[in-house]
């Protein structure tokens, strides 16, 4: 009987010990802060001119810090200045042509056309009377048929000349046709667009920094003939600075966008940077080879982007970091 009691007591003690260990392990796993490993990810941008030309000068070198709007380099702007002057002249010519069409014809021009109509009328009257005389003479066999035909041809030509002069006078009196004015307006709009493009091209002979950063590479030197979009500088942007890390599915619930984390580097293990989770990938992927955590290397993980809110110059592209989540 005593032996049975001892066995039962031993079983109860073993069960209680197992439960206690399980509870302790559960609390330990849930109370421990999540630690991830990642790398600093700083964006870089390739800067170049939008237009082609000969590189005239560069104002910065590798390692220089730049600020938004700073002049980094210039192209030879001579060809673009000439193009701008030509475009300005074309606009002035188109404006003058449109103004001339809208103003219509001057009184002096109209008077000149009236005089032309009167001259053509007199010429027609003479030719018509001459034809009538020739017709009378032809009836009496005094002129040949050939002479009569010549008189008729001269009369017809005089009539055509008179009609052309009358049409010209009517146009001068009524002004230019709406279609001609519309065409001149379209021509002016085209030359103005060409002028705007010439101005933009001239502006783009100056390379400006789009944002703050540090010059990583200076790819060309003054005197180089560049095509549009050739890389002149490669710049690392100082803002934003991110950390790329990966979390397993088991801990995905702790990686909530907006959550605050601490980021440690080997150079300052006791003074963390602060960051916020800005992005969590919606799709899983196999762990990249760069992940430092051995137990994640065969897992499917989710990529995180952590934005460093107090970044400084000590953070460099690719630097390994440790990301710690606050204890729950």
Swiss-Prot record:
- Superkingdom of this entry's organism? Bacteria
State its location(s): Periplasm
Matching entries from HAMAP family are given as: UPF0194
Q: Which family does it belong to?
A: Belongs to the UPF0194 family.
Record's InterPro entries?
Answer: CusB_D23, UPF0194_membrane_YbhG, UPF0194_transport
| Keywords associated with the record | Coiled coil, Periplasm, Signal
This protein's name: UPF0194 membrane protein YPTS_1292
The leader peptide range reads 1-22
- Chief location of this protein within or outside the cell: periplasm
Q: Name one Pfam family in it.
A: HlyD_D23
Coiled coil ranges (UniProt) are: 80-109, 142-209
> Cellular component GO terms, alphabetically?
periplasmic space
The species this protein was found in? Yersinia pseudotuberculosis serotype IB (strain PB1/+)
């Amino acid at each position: 009987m005593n032996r049975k009691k001892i066995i039962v007591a031993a079983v109860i003690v073993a069960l209680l010990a197992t439960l206690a260990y399980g509870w302790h392990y559960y609390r330990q796993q849930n109370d421990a802060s999540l630690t991830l490993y990642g790398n600093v990810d700083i964006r870089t941008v390739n800067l170049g001119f939008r237009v082609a030309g000969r590189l005239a000068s560069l104002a910065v070198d590798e390692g220089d810090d730049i600020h938004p709007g700073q002049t980094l380099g210039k192209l030879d702007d001579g060809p673009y200045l000439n193009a701008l002057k030509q475009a300005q002249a074309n606009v002035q010519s188109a404006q003058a042509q449109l103004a001339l069409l809208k103003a219509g014809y001057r009184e002096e021009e109209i008077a000149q056309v009236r005089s032309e109509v009167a001259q053509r009328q007199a010429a027609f009257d003479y030719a018509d009377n001459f034809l009538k005389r020739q017709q009378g003479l032809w009836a009496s066999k005094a002129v040949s048929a050939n002479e009569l035909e010549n008189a008729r041809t001269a009369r017809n030509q005089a009539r055509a000349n008179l009609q052309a002069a009358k049409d010209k006078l009517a146009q001068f009196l009524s002004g230019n046709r709406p279609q001609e004015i519309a065409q001149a307006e379209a021509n002016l709009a085209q030359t103005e667009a060409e002028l705007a493009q010439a101005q933009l091209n001239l502006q783009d002979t100056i390379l400006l920094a789009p944002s703050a950063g540090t010059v990583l590479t200076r790819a060309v030197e003054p005197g180089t003939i560049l095509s549009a979009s050739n890389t002149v500088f490669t710049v690392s942007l100082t803002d934003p600075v991110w950390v790329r890390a990966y979390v397993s599915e088991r801990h995905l619930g702790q990686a909530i966008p907006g959550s605050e984390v601490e980021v440690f580097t080997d150079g300052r293990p006791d003074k963390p940077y602060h960051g916020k989770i800005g992005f969590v990938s919606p799709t899983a992927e196999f762990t990249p080879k760069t992940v430092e955590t051995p137990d994640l290397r065969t897992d499917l993980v989710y990529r995180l982007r952590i934005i460093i809110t107090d970044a400084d110059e000590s953070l460099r592209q690719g630097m390994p970091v440790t990301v710690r989540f606050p204890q729950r």
